[in-house]
Swiss-Prot record:
Protein name: Phenylalanine ammonia-lyase
NCBIfam families: phe_am_lyase
Active site: Y106 (proton donor/acceptor)
Gene name as annotated: ZB8
Keywords attached to this entry: Cytoplasm, Lyase, Phenylalanine catabolism, Phenylpropanoid metabolism
Metabolic or biological pathway: Phenylpropanoid metabolism; trans-cinnamate biosynthesis; trans-cinnamate from L-phenylalanine: step 1/1
Length: 713
């Protein structure tokens, strides 16, 4: 049996024809190719694109990072590729000729939507009416939260220009140039926050861009200085000559009947989401460092056997951060000292972080590609096919890729936030954090220092709101426009909710990063204090235990090694505020070493010169006189930068993030003795993240990664 243009399937079943290898008419091949390479490399590319000073568009190659750059109203300028002018003009001319020839076309000679049975020969008037009736948004006072953020509006303007440049929409090139001039002059039309279902495109908000271009009296824009201006002043600031545009047939519909507002905001959201996903991976590795975790969880074989690329990459990135980490070397020594000091396996928030983050990265990456396709698509109706001389009536305005991608992205963001909260909760809990103080309290008196307790409560609040936002938008569709738009994507609504989720994840990331830096500093104090305690105890032991009253060597001198073991086993912050207190474990355990030696001393205990027990009081008295001062001196040395032992963080690949938070942003180690609050410090990090200042130190942590896991050996 043979198949035309194909081959019989391998099992030989009749009637089943498998297509032969050929071109990629369904676009699956291209979609697959777009996912090759590492996620980190893709993020690096995005960052490089974001920083380019010129965004040149021709309709088919716009990137989400470029949208984010223009939306931010920074240095990026927009330029229209002249190669698009001819095809844009051709479609515009076709519409005019079509109407003059009496061709009946939707939105040119007909009414709109469910009322498309109506007819008119007044093409220009029809477009003006379209813009008028779509100006149905509400702004309130303009300061009460009913206005779409300027960044989202700028993103929408850029995306709409790009999609119209492909020449299938019937609009003049000059209108697109005018919108680009508004962008470059940082003049932003005021669009309503709500009012679109992103089904026949984002009709209502886009109509306000059209209203400004056509000089409607109710059109308002925000000038570069933040003041509100009318259409005439907006044109003057932007340097647009020739007055307002009188819309020709189809031009109003071309401007409003597209998905640019939803996909524009989605682009800015995904630029942030991709970077925050990388940050979550690195913070998970730093969490392992300060928790004295076991890096075995990143071993490549574990993840290779699971097959999921997001998981494999997340593990490889964490593995890279932890490879050679001074904290991991120290944690290994602690484990060898006493394997029973902590559980055999770390808890899920650490040990399964690659398995948890991997699928979220895959979702965010897939959503990024989907939105990138959308912002380069022709998404209005009808489409003008000049080559075949016809108007195609379809539904590319349906923004389902936006609604679905944003719902999925928001769920992924919620999952990342949940992991971050679980890690934070372990970090501040002294039952789980392997020796750090409760609430990461950094002061000398834990009764007057509750550290990050308030921050943990805030994190619970953030996480709860984020989990609520994780619920889908797209299952709340209502039939609209006289049941013509009976299914609709809710793309912009979903994008807005995802934008909210991004803001919350930034709050959580800022809080967690400050807490991790606090933990790094506490580990530094811990190591210096422990060293000081060992030195002090050894000095006291040599003074009080080495000899008897006659100067002969005493059997108690053999306690020194066991005393050091007990110091190593005991958490510094379990006793540091009052080391000689009998309510704390250190003195009890040191005494117990001497008591055990005394019990093993047999009959020699009955001789005053050989009794170990007789040495206990002298040993403890000397410790009370010297140990508190030794601990205070060690803490003070860390605080004034003269610590005997340097911080291990400087020997770690995660150091650039710590340096960024502590040195560049000037955040401080928090204690109850000082007036500075956690909120004041984490707000510095939040502002920096909002400004994108965290990107370079984050990528610096990974600059040596070659894109592969460590070899299995």
């Amino acid at each position: 049996m043979e198949c035309e243009n194909g081959r019989v399937s391998a099992n030989g079943m009749s009637g089943l024809c498998v297509a032969a290898p050929r071109a990629d008419p369904l676009n699956w091949g291209k979609a697959t190719e777009e996912m090759t390479g590492s996620h980190l490399d893709e993020v690096k590319r995005m960052v490089a694109e974001y920083r380019q000073p010129l965004v040149k568009i021709e309709g088919a190659s716009l990137r989400i990072a470029q949208v984010a750059a223009v939306a931010a109203a920074g240095e990026a300028r927009v330029e229209l590729d002249e190669s698009a002018r001819e095809r844009v003009k051709a479609s515009s001319d076709w519409v005019m000729n079509s109407m003059m020839n009496g061709t009946d076309s939707y939105g040119v000679t007909t009414g709109f939507g469910a009322t498309s049975h109506r007819r008119t020969k007044e093409g220009g008037a029809l477009q003006r009416e379209l813009i008028r009736f779509l100006n149905a948004g509400a702004f309130g006072t303009g300061t009460d939260g009913h206005v779409l953020p300027a960044e989202a509006t700028r993103a929408a303007m850029l995306v709409r220009i790009n999609t119209l440049l492909q020449g299938y929409s019937g609009i003049r090139f000059e209108i697109l140039e005018a919108i680009a001039k508004l962008l470059n002059a940082n003049v932003t039309p005021c669009l309503p926050l709500r009012g679109t279902i992103t089904a026949s495109g984002d009709l209502v908000p886009l109509s306000y861009i059209a209203g400004l271009v056509t000089g409607r009296e109710n059109a308002v824009a925000v000038a570069p200085d933040g003041s509100k201006v009318n259409a005439a002043e907006a044109f003057k600031i932007a340097g647009i000559q020739g007055g307002f545009f009188e819309l020709q047939p189809k031009e109003g519909l071309a401007m409003v009947n597209g998905t640019a507002v939803g996909s524009g905001l989605a682009s800015t959201v995904l630029f942030e989401a991709n970077i925050l996903a990388i940050l979550a991976e690195v913070l998970s590795a730093v969490f392992c460092e300060v928790m004295n975790g076991k890096p075995e969880y990143t071993d490549h074989l574990t993840h290779k056997l699971k097959h999921h690329p997001g998981q494999i990459e997340a593990a490889a990135i964490m593995e890279h951060i932890l490879e050679g980490s001074s904290y991991m070397k120290h944690a290994k020594k602690l484990g060898e000292l006493d394997p029973l000091m902590k559980p055999k396996q770390d808890r899920y928030a650490l040990r399964t972080s690659p398995q948890w983050l991997g699928p979220q990265i895959e979702v965010i990456r897939a959503a990024t590609k989907s939105i990138e396709r959308e912002i380069n698509s022709v998404n209005d109706n009808p489409l003008i096919d000049v080559s075949r001389g016809k108007a195609l009536h379809g539904g590319n305005f349906q923004g389902t890729p936006i609604g679905v991608s944003m719902d999925n992205t928001r769920l992924a963001i919620a999952a990342i936030g949940k992991l971050m909260f679980a890690q934070f909760s372990e970090l501040v809990n002294d039952f789980y954090n392997n020796g750090l103080p409760s609430n990461l309290s950094g002061g000398r008196n834990p009764s007057l220092d509750y550290g990050f307790k308030g921050a943990e409560i805030a994190m619970a609040s953030y996480c709860s709101e984020l989990q609520f936002l994780g619920n889908p938008v797209t299952n709340h569709v209502q039939s609209a426009e006289q049941h013509n738009q009976d299914v609709n994507s809710l793309g912009l609504i979903s994008s807005r909710k995802t934008d909210e989720a991004i803001d919350i994840l930034k709050l959580m990331s800022s809080t967690f990063l400050i807490a991790l830096c606090q933990a790094v500093d506490l580990r530094h104090i811990e190591e210096n204090v422990k060293s000081a305690v060992k030195s002090c105890v050894m000095t006291v032991a040599k003074k009080t235990l080495s000899t008897n009253s006659t100067g002969d060597l005493h059997v108690a001198r053999f306690c020194e090694k066991d005393l050091l073991k007990e110091i190593d086993r005991e958490a510094v912050f379990a006793y540091a505020d009052d080391p000689c207190s009998h309510n704390y474990p250190l003195m009890k355990k040191l005494r117990n070493v001497l008591v055990e030696r005394a019990l093993a001393n047999g009959a020699a205990e009955f001789n005053a010169d050989t009794s170990v027990f007789a040495k206990v009081a002298q040993f403890e008295e000397e410790l009370r006189a010297t140990l508190p001062g030794a601990i205070e001196a060690a803490r003070a040395a860390v605080e004034n930068g003269t610590a005997a032992i340097p911080s291990r963080i400087t020997e770690c690949r995660s150091y650039p993030l710590y340096r960024f938070v502590r040195e560049e942003l000037g955040t401080k180690y928090l204690t109850g003795e000082k007036t500075r609050s956690p909120g004041e410090e984490l707000n510095k990090v939040l502002v920096a993240i909002n400004e994108g200042k965290h990107i370079d130190p984050l990528l610096e942590c990974l600059k040596e990664w070659n894109g592969e896991p460590l070899p299995i050996c």
